[in-house]
């Protein structure tokens, strides 16, 4: 078989002299490879050398191959499968929203009298729920998270309901005692965690308590401040707007007076509710006897077996957050069809005005809209970013129209994440949103004001920190997942509405346990694969061919591959990525050491034959190496970076080992594919220049100019990957994105950061 050489001469590789006459015939089974010339100025991208101490030695990782470990791994996989099946069952039965019961809303529904004129409540099961759910200290409210506002609101409402029907005096007395002893604590509540409409609803409850002669410290200074705030807010409410168009004010009608119910009834949601609030709807029914309001209340009382939530339904919100949590926890691949069903539902209900928590609510918000935009765009749906203009005013972005408080952390965090998914030609609103949200979050982060008015989650500061420090273009899936496993609170996360509530479908411990087990399986596979990769590396004697820290280069190369391609059935792809990266680094190190391929005198077949490949793909792999090595020679004289060609080599190798590679001449989608290659090469070359510019102390303006160029090309690559040619396999398109994002990650991260991520992702056990 003829041997290819870029200069039509034999080359010495790594100081192993050989001439054409000295060339030995290939042994049976040995595959011939290419000898080419290339030059790379400095390592960049996946070849960046880290300077940390060595990672665990091969003896330490061999324990993962012991029979007992394999048995443990099998048990863990079986347990993981069981949990995954449980999550899948829940997703397939997803409906209008699974949410905890609100004692406050249940009590207001319990006040409704029988429709037939008889004595007693229309919904006696609500009374049963109240009686059965008093807490040991005499209060009602969230049992696991103590917030005084939540406990006072819930307890006072339950006492009012029981006293109104003159039943369960003992429970009323215990509830009153709790209120009497704790009302003063309202003055010390966390301002950022104020319940929705608290200053409107609590005075209304207190007025009802007065009418029932309940012994409550009405002159408590904390209550005087709340009454004053109520008057201030009610005075600001434009009555004509309240009665003429849907607003968030409809969510708190139970706290308002002098309402024109005939006008308000025209503003009901299609399901008969007022802004999906049982308490507000119960008040409306009490005042009007409207049949649609009754049907809404009757339906939720039956669904929740006597108790009612503080808001319902939440069909859009629940689907969006479930998909987001599953994705960030790294287990979304197990629920492909279920996620598709969820997002199809979201897309069907997408509107030019955005999204609300439910499809029938006319009052849209930026939180649901931004999350919906981001997920739909990520999964290939066509959505217009101009929808975010609905939440922009005077250069600022807000969550809800007419909100009285400044924007809060989580809505701006979700909008910031969404704003990074830009395509060429998109309206400038995404750029403006990114700038505003980043500034807002930086300000909150810098002043340590990270409490959110909508959620009390385990580690919101950590989530925001990751998003700020690692933009989407440089965020690798396994890094995000490993960190999110420590940030996700599971069943401990609480949401703030009129009262505290919990979203049990996507905030639960089953998600967390399944994700941790899944990640533990991944870590064990990584350690086994790394052990094998080390042995291959030592057996191949690659260390002698150069490199500042070959062992760390090995670790970094494998880490970048596994941080992107982590599925158990794709081991060949990540190992192919790692081996090709190591070989390319060895060739490049050697050529840099000897002054370029022009000073080489022998062939490269010994080195290239170290890459194992199936005969079916040998031609493709040879061609990939040939083109990369030719690029060395072509770019040697021009001093151009070889990083773009290295990125293409990695893409082609991954596709070859994944069994998806098609020879160039056989591609029906040649133009689209070549565009992906050109963008990938160009971006990675620019990232190399960025690294060099920083190392050489060039101006900040120069680095920013390169960043802008990278961002523009990244937008085009993102569009082509997420919504590009359907003739190109989705996995193939994603391969380009994986490789480019790995180059971005290395370009933007210090070696110390990369080392810490390697340790965290692969070696620190998930607890």
From Swiss-Prot:
Recorded GO CC terms: chloroplast
UniProt cross-references to InterPro entries, sorted A to Z: Isoprenoid_synthase_dom_sf, Terpene_synth_N, Terpene_synth_N_sf, Terpene_synthase-like, Terpenoid_cyclase/PrenylTrfase
Segments for region (Disordered): 45-74
Miscellaneous note of the record: Phytoalexins are diterpenoid secondary metabolites involved in the defense mechanism of the plant and produced in response to attack (by a pathogen, elicitor or UV irradiation).
Naturally occurring in which organism (per UniProt): Oryza sativa subsp. japonica
UniProt-listed Enzyme Commission number(s): 5.5.1.14
Top-tier EC class: isomerase
Protein name in the entry: Syn-copalyl diphosphate synthase, chloroplastic
Enzymatic reactions: (2E,6E,10E)-geranylgeranyl diphosphate = 9alpha-copalyl diphosphate
Family recorded in the similarity comment: Belongs to the terpene synthase family.
Keywords on record: Chloroplast, Isomerase, Magnesium, Metal-binding, Plant defense, Plastid, Transit peptide
Mutant phenotype after disruption: No visible phenotype under normal growth conditions. Mutant plants exhibit increased susceptibility to the rice blast fungus Magnaporthe grisea, and reduced capacity to inhibit germination and growth of lowland weeds in paddy soil, possibly due to decreased levels of momilactones and oryzalexin S.
Residue ranges of the motif DXDD motif: 365-368
Compartments, record wording: Plastid, Chloroplast
Any single biological process term in GO: gibberellin biosynthetic process
SUPFAM superfamilies recorded: Terpenoid cyclases/Protein prenyltransferases, Terpenoid synthases
Chain residues that bind substrate: 233, 453
């Amino acid at each position: 078989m003829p041997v290819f050489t870029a200069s039509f001469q034999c080359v010495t590789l790594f100081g192993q002299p050989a001439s054409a006459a000295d060339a030995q015939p290939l042994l049976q089974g040995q595959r011939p490879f290419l000898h080419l010339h290339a030059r790379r100025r400095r390592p960049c991208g996946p070849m960046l050398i880290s300077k940390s101490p060595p990672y665990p030695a091969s003896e330490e990782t061999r324990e993962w191959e012991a029979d007992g470990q394999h048995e443990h791994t099998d048990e863990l996989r079986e347990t993981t499968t069981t949990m995954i099946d449980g999550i899948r069952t829940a997703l397939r039965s997803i409906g209008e929203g699974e949410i905890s019961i609100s004692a406050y809303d249940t009590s207001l529904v319990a006040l409704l009298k029988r429709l037939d004129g008889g004595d007693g409540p229309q919904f006696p099961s609500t009374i049963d729920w109240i009686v059965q759910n008093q807490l040991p200290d005499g209060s009602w409210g969230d049992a696991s998270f103590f917030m005084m506002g939540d406990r006072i609101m819930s307890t006072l409402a339950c006492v009012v309901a029981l006293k109104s029907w003159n039943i369960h005096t003992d429970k009323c007395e215990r509830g009153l005692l709790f209120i009497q002893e704790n009302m003063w604590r309202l003055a010390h509540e966390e301002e950022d965690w104020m319940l929705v409409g608290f200053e409107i609803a609590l005075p209304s409850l207190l007025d009802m308590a007065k009418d029932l002669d309940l012994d409550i410290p009405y002159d408590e200074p904390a209550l005087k401040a709340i009454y004053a705030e109520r008057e201030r807010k009610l005075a600001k409410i434009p009555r004509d707007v309240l009665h003429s168009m849907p607003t968030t004010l409809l969510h708190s009608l139970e706290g308002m007076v002098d309402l024109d119910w005939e006008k308000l009834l025209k503003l009901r949601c299609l399901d008969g509710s007022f802004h999906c609030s049982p308490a507000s709807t119960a008040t409306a029914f009490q005042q009007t006897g409207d049949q649609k309001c009754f049907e809404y209340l009757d339906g939720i009382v039956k669904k929740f077996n006597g108790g009612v939530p503080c808001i319902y339904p939440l069909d859009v919100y629940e689907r969006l957050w479930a998909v987001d949590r599953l994705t960030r926890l790294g287990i979304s691949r197990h629920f492909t069809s279920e996620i598709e069903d969820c997002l199809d539902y979201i897309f069907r209900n997408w509107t030019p005005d955005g999204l609300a928590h439910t499809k029938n609510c006319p009052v849209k918000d930026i939180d649901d809209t931004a999350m919906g935009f981001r997920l739909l765009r990520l999964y290939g749906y066509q959505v217009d970013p101009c929808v975010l203009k609905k939440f922009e005013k005077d250069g600022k972005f807000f969550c809800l129209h007419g909100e009285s408080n400044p924007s809060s952390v989580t809505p701006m965090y979700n909008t910031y994440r969404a704003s990074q998914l830009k395509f060429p030609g998109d309206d400038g609103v995404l750029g403006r949103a990114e700038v505003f949200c980043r500034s807002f979050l930086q300000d909150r982060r810098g002043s340590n004001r990270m409490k959110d008015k909508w959620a009390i989650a385990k580690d919101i500061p950590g989530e925001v920190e990751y998003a700020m420090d690692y933009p989407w273009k440089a965020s690798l899936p396994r890094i995000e997942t490993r960190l999110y496993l420590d940030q996700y609170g599971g069943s401990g996360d609480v949401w703030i509405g009129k009262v505290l509530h919990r979203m049990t479908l996507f905030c639960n411990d089953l998600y967390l346990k399944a994700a941790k087990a899944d990640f533990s399986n991944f870590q064990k596979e990584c350690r086994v694969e790394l052990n094998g990769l080390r042995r291959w590396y030592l057996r191949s004697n690659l260390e002698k061919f150069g490199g500042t820290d070959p062992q760390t280069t090995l670790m970094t190369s494998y880490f970048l591959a596994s941080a992107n391609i982590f599925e158990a059935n794709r081991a060949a792809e990540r190992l192919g990525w790692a081996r090709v990266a190591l070989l390319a680094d060895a060739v490049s190190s050697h050529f840099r050491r000897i002054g370029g391929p022009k000073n080489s005198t022998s062939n490269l077949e010994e080195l290239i034959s170290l890459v194992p490949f199936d005969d079916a793909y040998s031609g493709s792999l040879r061609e990939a190496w040939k083109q990369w090595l030719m690029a060395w020679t072509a770019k040697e004289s021009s001093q151009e970076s070889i990083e773009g060609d290295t990125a293409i080599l990695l893409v082609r190798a991954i596709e070859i080992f994944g069994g998806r590679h098609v020879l160039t001449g056989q591609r029906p989608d040649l133009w689209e594919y070549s565009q992906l290659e050109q963008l990938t090469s160009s971006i990675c070359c620019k990232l190399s220049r960025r690294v060099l510019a920083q190392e050489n102390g060039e101006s900040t303006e120069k680095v920013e100019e390169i960043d802008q160029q990278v961002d523009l090309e990244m937008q085009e690559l993102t569009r082509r990957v997420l919504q590009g040619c359907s003739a190109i396999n989705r996995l193939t398109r994603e391969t380009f994105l994986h490789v480019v994002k790995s180059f971005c990650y290395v370009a933007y991260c210090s070696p110390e950061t990369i080392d810490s991520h390697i340790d965290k992702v692969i070696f620190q056990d998930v607890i």
